[in-house]
Amino acid sequence: MTLNIKNHPCFNDSSRHTYGRIHLPVAPKCNIQCNYCNRKFDCMNENRPGITSKVLSPRQALYYLDNALKLSPNISVVGIAGPGDPFANPEETMETLRLVREKYPEMLLCVATNGLDMLPYIEELAELQVSHVTLTINAIDPEIGQEIYAWVRYQKKMYRDRQAAELLLENQLAALQKLKRYGVTAKVNSIIIPGVNDQHVIEVARQVASMGADILNALPYYNTTETVFENIPEPDPMMVRKIQEEAGKLLPQMKHCARCRADAVGIIGEINSDEMMAKLAEAALMPKNPDEHRPYIAVASLEGVLINQHLGEADRFLVYALDEEKKSCTLVDSRQAPPPGGGKLRWEALAAKLSDCRAVLVNSAGDSPQSVLKASGIDVMSIEGVIEEAVYGVFTGQNLKHLMKSSQIHACKTSCGGDGNGCD
């Protein structure tokens, strides 16, 4: 099928009042720390870039898209733009794109990325007819780049300072070249940060134009509290306009960017409707695969009051259900755990025993069982606290960070800047 790429409202100014877009928030982890970015993304009341109220699994995202299209049939584009980086979450990103392409062959697909980890996926992106990719390139001089990025995490190794900026730039430019070889429309975002790169954005424009970039979005930096750059003011409109005019001599400019949330939906510039956000929240409460019937949550507990047992040490799991009025949860079963030993087979047996559970709440768990259970559609959540509070919170989509153990939060990948260590 030939896609009508003119209907992309972010790349075509004439389409933005007619066609809408939807960002599916399936990518919470990030592989770099920008000095202007606050990784606390779970917020309903802010509208800064990267914010989302929920994070979805790929199949939850498809369920949400189905409902969103009923409310806004003018949506022409499905994008993945965070709240982290799509290719720091490659499995979730690629599965989501595959699911959407299969069900909605006429839909435009796009991703927005920093480009660090994108290279291995470009060929499949082209096969899936991902027509538009946005790369954020804030500097082509590593001396400037090292002022913008606190760290870069690539192939499980940490990089800082100039080395980090050089690695990021190398991968960004290689990704841009490969995207153009595969015929993908490439937009480059370059964030104007006063006193840091405002005198350099034109050089970025010149470089990416020479490599075939289709459009540049020179957009003003968004001042965000609790960041390294929190004391840097946003650029004034005159500075932005001058940079856009000068860059416009090199390649076309996008001038209608709304610096969208990672869960933005509808016409650019319009606030997400309450009805649409209710559909997003509904999707987040579904099992990871909404087509499956998983009405329960399992818990590892020594005495039946607290979540205080390691997954591998539990000899039985308590199983809870949400009551019909959704005001409390009830213990409905107790299931024996498979005997110790057996490696992966043990965890596959546990997954079978808990096949009607959407999550298992434990004090801690190893990587191997987490991987097996996740592949079976069961979330493993490391939590400390009272069973009823935690189980009810998971069922109803509450923020449980106050109960989560630090190993579950993964500071350097998801909800805060961290220092980039301890991610795995």
From Swiss-Prot:
GO biological process: nitrogen fixation
Domain of life: Bacteria
UniProt cofactor note: Binds 3 [4Fe-4S] clusters per monomer. One cluster is coordinated with 3 cysteines and an exchangeable S-adenosyl-L-methionine. The two others probably act as substrate.
Cofactor dependency: [4Fe-4S] cluster
Swiss-Prot/TrEMBL keywords: 4Fe-4S, Iron, Iron-sulfur, Lyase, Metal-binding, Nitrogen fixation, S-adenosyl-L-methionine
CDD domains linked: NifB, Radical_SAM
InterPro entries xref list: Aldolase_TIM, Di-Nase_FeMo-co_biosynth, DiNase_FeMo-co_biosyn_sf, Elp3/MiaA/NifB-like_rSAM, MoaA_NifB_PqqE_Fe-S-bd_CS, Nase_CF_NifB, NifB_C, rSAM
SUPFAM superfamilies associated with the record: Nitrogenase accessory factor-like, Radical SAM enzymes
Annotated Radical SAM core domain residues: 12-261
Residues at which S-adenosyl-L-methionine binds: 84, 136, 188
Chain sites annotated for binding [4Fe-4S] cluster 2: 257, 260
Protein function: Involved in the biosynthesis of the iron-molybdenum cofactor (FeMo-co or M-cluster) found in the dinitrogenase enzyme of the nitrogenase complex in nitrogen-fixing microorganisms. NifB catalyzes the crucial step of radical SAM-dependent carbide insertion that occurs concomitant with the insertion of a 9th sulfur and the rearrangement/coupling of two [4Fe-4S] clusters into a [8Fe-9S-C] cluster, the precursor to the M-cluster.
Name the record gives this protein: FeMo cofactor biosynthesis protein NifB
